[in-house]
A protein has these predicted regions:
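Tandem repeat scaffolds
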Residues: 1-129
Length: 129
């Protein structure tokens, strides 16, 4: 699968106000500012390391195997999101909603988690400090 470049993603962002159900598998979004609605988006294997996703809506999105190392996810909606095998090392999840999210096998070492809502979230086999 070809990795989508940041320029291609910027073009998509210009054309759409929200990115509901958008296919961004393998996208290179390293360090991008993405304050959008990604509800139901496919972001499997995407590089979102150091991305600024503050306040974004990622509910019901598929983020399996995504790289979210050092990402700013403060106050982000991640309800019902598939985060299995996601690398979240050093990510800031302050005030994030992870209700019913699937975090099995996710790497959560060094994450910032104050005031995070996790009702019904599945952390089975996830790596934590």
């Amino acid at each position: 699968m070809k990795r989508i470049s940041i320029k291609e993603v910027e073009k998509i962002l210009e054309e759409k106000r929200n990115l509901i159900k958008v296919d961004l598998r393998f996208a290179d979004l390293h360090g991008a500012y993405l304050h959008k609605n990604f509800c139901g988006a496919d972001l499997r294997f995407a590089d979102l390391s150091r991305a600024d996703l503050r306040g974004a809506i990622l509910s019901c999105a598929d983020l399996r195997f995504a790289d979210l190392r050092g990402a700013d996810l403060r106050n982000t909606g991640l309800n019902l999101t598939d985060l299995r095998f996601t690398d979240l090392r050093g990510a800031n999840l302050s005030g994030t909603e992870l209700n019913l999210a699937d975090l099995r096998f996710a790497d959560l070492r060094g994450t910032i988690l104050p005031e995070t809502k996790t009702v019904g979230a599945n952390f089975l086999f996830s790596a934590r400090d």
